[in-house]
Swiss-Prot record:
CDD domains: GMPK
Domain of life per record: Bacteria
Residues that bind ATP: S22, P23, S24, G25, A26, G27, K28, T29
Protein name per UniProt: Guanylate kinase
GO cellular-component term (any): cytosol
Keyword annotations of the record: ATP-binding, Cytoplasm, Kinase, Nucleotide-binding, Transferase
InterPro entries membership: GK/Ca_channel_bsu (IPR008145), Guanylate_kin-like_dom (IPR008144), Guanylate_kinase (IPR017665), Guanylate_kinase_CS (IPR020590), P-loop_NTPase (IPR027417)
Annotated compartments: Cytoplasm
EC number: 2.7.4.8
Keyword Kinase part of the UniProt annotation: yes
UniProt domain Guanylate kinase-like: residue ranges: 15-194
Length: 219
């Protein structure tokens, strides 16, 4: 059994699903990368998607790239914890690897939208911790979308229009982080994860630990 299985203080715990959502360009992908790089015991959920692979992406690392027929079969077999249709493509989270991680005390990071978060909450409410990342202003969000130079002006306009709808779901999340500065936002998100890992109900080995402590105190 590893330190992650037992928790960092030696007490066994169940893993959690740590969800980051935001409008495109608000910073959730950058924050997800920083969490994976800097936080021990956290792995990124690899989504299945029907969208084309982008330059530099690796199948199985960034996404599991599948065709529409394969994705439909996964939905039919209930192999996905959540799935959504976004910008003419399907995205979904395979169930089996997440279940295995949580059972062994490891945490799984989800970079998904509000639709996926709703589905996760419906299926596994006690395991889900959700964080919505907001930009400091609409102008700042548009500037970020232009700066990353990934999309045409038409696509950026579409993303800005969609952002208004996505932001309307902010109150469905457990925590809200306003990303004015990426380092400050990361510190806030990391603090949320640290606190949630210590929740009593997730620490499955706590009862046995306290009983043993009581036994020692009473002898």
């Amino acid at each position: 059994m590893t330190a992650h299985d037992r928790g960092f203080d030696g007490v066994e715990r169940r893993g959690l699903m740590f969800v980051l959502s935001s409008p495109s360009g608000a910073g959730k992908t950058t924050l997800s990368r920083l969490l994976i790089e800097r936080v021990e015991g956290l792995s990124l959920s690899v989504s299945a998607t029907t969208r084309p692979m982008r330059p530099g992406e690796v199948d199985g690392r960034d996404y599991a790239f599948v065709d529409e027929k394969t994705f439909a079969a996964m939905v039919e077999r209930n192999d996905l914890l959540e799935w959504a249709h976004v910008f003419d493509n399907h995205y979904g989270t395979p169930r089996a690897p997440v279940d295995a991680a949580l059972s062994s005390g490891r945490d799984v990071l989800f970079d998904i939208d509000w639709q996926g978060t709703q589905q996760l909450r419906e299926k596994a409410r006690d395991d889900v911790v959700s964080v919505f990342i907001l930009p400091p202003s609409a102008a700042d969000l548009e500037r970020r979308l232009h700066t990353r130079a990934q999309d045409s002006d038409d696509v950026i306009r579409e993303r800005m229009a969609r952002a208004a709808h996505e932001v309307s779901h902010w109150a469905e999340y457990d925590y809200i982080v306003i990303n004015r500065d990426i380092d400050e936002a990361f510190a806030e998100v990391q603090s949320i994860l640290k606190a949630e890992r210590l929740k009593r109900e997730r620490r499955t080995g706590l009862t046995a630990f306290v009983r043993e402590l009581q036994r020692q105190l009473e002898t």
